Amino acid sequence: MVNTKVTLCGVEIDNPIIPASGTYGFGYEFAELYDINILGSLSFKGTTLNPRFGNPTPRIAECPEGMLNAVGLQNPGVDLVKSREIPKLREVFNKPMMANVSGFSEYEYVTTVERLDSEADIGWFEVNISCPNVHGGGMSFGTSPESAEAITRAVRRVTKKPLIIKLSPNVTDIVSIAKACEAGGADGVSLINTLMGMRIDLKKRKPILANKTGGYSGPAILPVAVRMVYQVYDAVKIPIVGMGGVSTAEDVIEFMLAGATAVEVGAANLVNPYACRDIINDLPVVMEKYGIKNLSEIIGGAH
């Protein structure tokens, strides 16, 4: 009998599998397909202070081994998320949920977290300082250690819930930014967000995406993500949520050996809506294959 339980920032979860924000809606949509309570947790759709309609179309471009997206944080805004979306999720999900939050100023980040903080079902905040697909100041918080630490401190002051900062790979040194978030009071970091990319339509001789650039995700980015998780694990003492190209139980084990406590599944959900269920079902089989009895014991095992 294998043990898939892990403890993320003081909260025990049944397994390390968490659908990544932006690929799983608000979660309840997937409850029509399978019992989502098999998940470790879920990170619901990125939430901003005000409603956002997102970027103009086309927003998606298929690529070999992945996809580009420039959705632009489309969401109904924090007030509707709180009054409409979370209650719908609560009806079908009885575990702590992860609230993914983004913003374009310190005020927006802080106010959004403040408004969600009273929700008892939120087990963690995942603060996205790295989304590359919006116009405005959101990206700047994740591109320097100073700004990353400042936004972490600001949000830390308004919540006692575990605070996980989501990091961008589109930086010179992700390790220094992770350390800055830790210094600012983060309880954990999640990485990586998407890699900035572009595709060009050969007939039109124009970028395919209306936004021109977008975030590249899918299996091709996994080696980059594993490398960054490995590097960050050596530099910080807080837990890491790893993500980037995960589509199999073997990928989950690889991320955990690199240093991840939990693992988010993103683009795979868009290709196969049963991806998280399949990975969770396969995990004990893969653990047996590699002689793993307790998942929590392999965290950082490749170091």
Residue map of PLM features:
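Hydrophobic faces of well-ordered beta-strands that scaffold small-molecule active sites
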Residues: 17-20, 40-44, 97-101, 125-127, ...
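Glycine-rich phosphate-binding active-site loops on the catalytic face of alpha/beta enzymes
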Residues: 43-49, 129-131, 188-198, 245-246, ...
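N-terminal capping/small domains of soluble enzymes
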Residues: 1-97, 102-104
